[in-house]
Amino acid sequence: MPYGDSFQKDVEEAEDIAHTLGIHSETIDISPSVDAFYSRYPTKKRVLIGNKMARERMSILYDFSARQNALILGTSNKTELLLGYGTIHGDMACAINPIGDLYKTQVWQLGGHLGVPANILNKAPTAGLWDGQTDEDDLGLSYNEIDKILLQLIDKKKSRDELISSGFAKKKVDKIINMIKNSEFKRRMPPIAKLSEITAGNDIPCPYDQDK
């Protein structure tokens, strides 16, 4: 779902992979709908436009999922989810996420194991929000650096001080910790103001739990 002509190479590579795997694909240009909105409500903030593009793409995916009685597979990895590096109700929206517990570097390893073409694995990661945008430029750190810190911080439950004393740069550790804290809302369902004894989502058990 490209915007304009900026991502033509990405489109061609995606179509090549779909063809190789025998997967039906459709290319939908989101330019008309995005441009229509910003022609009325103009902005120069690239983040706003990028988020709009991500949500436009997800809106189209959900429409197709309803038409085909299908589930949307998420593509956010553990690194992106922990850092909140994604658009809420945009590329972070899905019904099931098969790679959400794999760090970015692990996704690369899995891709190599599965035979994903080198030109895809070696591409600079980008959300495709604007021409020339890359993940690592946005984050200010490489995924290799980030994942090494996250592995110690999350999986091995090391403290901030332990990470710094073991040789990780204080500035980088603090940046990652702050990103995790500031994006917690993206990893949770919206809180509900509790006004009754039984609150939907909080106190009502799933049907298969009611007999336990």
Each PLM stretch: what is its role?
Residues 27-32, 101-108, 208-212:
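Short C-terminal domain-edge/linker segments immediately following a structured domain
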Residues 2, 98, 117, 125, ...:
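Proline-rich low-complexity regions
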Residues 9-12, 32, 56-59, 102-106, ...:
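Conserved active-site and cofactor/substrate-binding residues in soluble primary-metabolism enzymes
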Residues 11, 38-41, 85-86, 131-135, ...:
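Short secondary-structure transition/capping segments
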Residues 1-84, 163:
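ATP-dependent adenylation/nucleotidyltransferase module used to activate substrates
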Residues 92, 133-212:
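Peripheral terminal appendages
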Residues 19, 49-57, 71-148, 152:
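Catalytic subdomain that performs nucleotidyl-dependent activation
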